[in-house]
Amino acid sequence: LTTPRHYAYVKIAEGCDRHCAYCAIPIITGKHVSRPKAEILQEVRDMVAEGVKEFQIIAQELTYYGIDLDGKHHITDLISDMADIPGVKWIRLHYAYPNQFPMDLLDVMREKENVCSYLDIALQHISDHMLTRMRRHVSKQETIELIKQFRERVPGIHIRTTLMVGFPGETDEDFAELMELSLIHISEPTR
């Protein structure tokens, strides 16, 4: 299968500094390295000229964009500037991390029509016991509050996530806690 002409992936960074217990990405790809903003924006302009309308923004850790450059989050400015490029119809954000999520990114999502109310964020688990074992550096309460903020600040947001079961040390109680989260906090009932 090929990617349709109107659709493109834009990689904004390579690597990851997180070192979660189950993940080999930092070993394989190395430390997080952000691409220069001007280079990314020019790539998007060039793709628009070729007929691309929908952009999937990807990185192993999207929300960390820019931290390696000067210690500050720059994902919000990047996405805002990208949304202002004539011809960009849709922008979707993939592979965010819950720890230190830049909340102003939600404002851009809400305010810019072409930034979809869609976020792919890897939660992995909800049990504090499992989050610690996985070295996720976020708690159950922080995760629940984050999801609540997503829903309050961007009504109708679509959250895509991955949840990991069977990680070594997971108990029946941990699993039950995870199922409760997925039913109550992530899923919205359909009618």
What are these regions (language model features)?
Residues 1-3:
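P-loop NTPase nucleotide-binding/switch module
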Residues 29-56:
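Conserved alpha-helical substructure of the radical SAM core
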Residues 16, 20-23, 40, 47, ...:
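Hydrophobic packing within well-folded, soluble alpha/beta domains
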Residues 163-164, 175-183:
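A glycine- and small/hydrophobic-rich beta-loop-beta segment
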Residues 49-172:
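Conserved SAM/AdoMet-binding glycine-rich loop
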Residues 182-191:
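Residue-level detector of conserved catalytic or cofactor/ligand-binding positions
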Residues 5-38:
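Canonical Radical SAM [4Fe-4S] cluster-binding loop centered on the CxxxCxxC motif
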